[in-house]
């Protein structure tokens, strides 16, 4: 009886869990498909600068901080 219970558990619980498609994988695939269709010039324009709180050196300023403008 124990062997039958183990087999039922494996085939009714564990096997379906391993065959389920994870929903978290889909946005990554969709994002990769969208980015794949972009031209290299368009891909470079997507990068965003992180907001900065401190001021940067004037010779290294890229316009992302408030003190540079």
Curated annotation (Swiss-Prot):
Its main location: secreted. Disulfide bonds join 55-67, 56-65, 61-68. InterPro entries: Conotoxin. Residues 1-20 form the signal peptide. Keywords: Disulfide bond, Secreted, Signal, Toxin. GO terms for cellular component: extracellular region. Pfam families: Conotoxin. Expressed by the venom duct. One of its GO terms (molecular function) is ion channel inhibitor activity. Residues 21-54 form a propeptide. It is found in: Secreted. The cysteine framework is III (CC-C-C-CC). Classified in the M-1 branch, since 1 residue stands between the fourth and the fifth cysteine residues. Belongs to the conotoxin M superfamily. This is Conotoxin Lp3.1. It comes from Conus leopardus. The lineage of its organism: Eukaryota, Metazoa, Spiralia, Lophotrochozoa, Mollusca.
